[in-house]
Swiss-Prot record:
The gene is dut. One of its GO terms (molecular function) is dUTP diphosphatase activity. Its cofactor is Mg(2+). It comes from Bordetella parapertussis (strain 12822 / ATCC BAA-587 / NCTC 13253). Keywords: Hydrolase, Magnesium, Metal-binding, Nucleotide metabolism. PANTHER family: DEOXYURIDINE 5'-TRIPHOSPHATE NUCLEOTIDOHYDROLASE. GO terms for biological process: dUMP biosynthetic process; dUTP catabolic process. This is Deoxyuridine 5'-triphosphate nucleotidohydrolase. Transmembrane segments: none annotated. Gene3D superfamilies: 2.70.40.10. Substrate binds at residues 68-70, 81, 85-87, 95.
Length: 149
């Protein structure tokens, strides 16, 4: 398996290096690399630095920033862009677009776990204009066509 080199921008992160929690974990926790607590008001979206920069450097891979389920379910804290896609040639700091969709202000403390980083394989495609498609059982059916609508 290819290893991705994570570069650290903030020296405080030495004590908070991302790690897989279990052998079956897919995601690495990203933390709020802030100097002070940050209050996110209901409906507000803020960019939160993670202190981490990555350069995957291999177009067969990308990274995805995903929300932590507990923050979304219990506090309404989700990603402002729903999913963050990090291309293999990006080299900057990872920032988390953080949206409070809840009804109460949320205080995000320094180094609090905020999101998850997952490395995924990528298959780039080539488009080919055709006259029609080969027939399939499903056809053009969508939006509930294979089950309960």
């Amino acid at each position: 398996m290819k290893s991705v080199d994570l570069k650290i921008l903030d020296a405080r992160m030495r004590e908070y290096l991302p790690a897989y929690a279990t052998p079956g974990s897919a995601g690495l926790d990203l933390r709020a690399c802030t100097e002070a607590s940050l209050v996110i008001e209901p409906g507000q979206t803020v960019l939160v630095p993670t202190g981490l920069a990555i350069h995957i450097g291999d177009p067969r891979y990308a990274a995805m920033i995903l929300p932590r389920s507990g923050l979304g379910h219990k506090h309404g804290i989700v990603l402002g862009n729903l999913v963050g896609l990090i291309d293999s040639d990006y080299q900057g700091q990872l920032m988390v677009s953080t949206w409070n969709r809840g009804t109460q202000p949320f205080t995000l403390d320094p180094m609090e776990r905020l999101a998850q980083l997952v490395i995924v394989p990528v298959q780039q495609v080539a488009f080919n204009v055709v006259e029609d498609f080969d027939a399939s059982e499903r056809g053009a059916g969508g939006f509930g066509s294979t089950g309960r609508a």
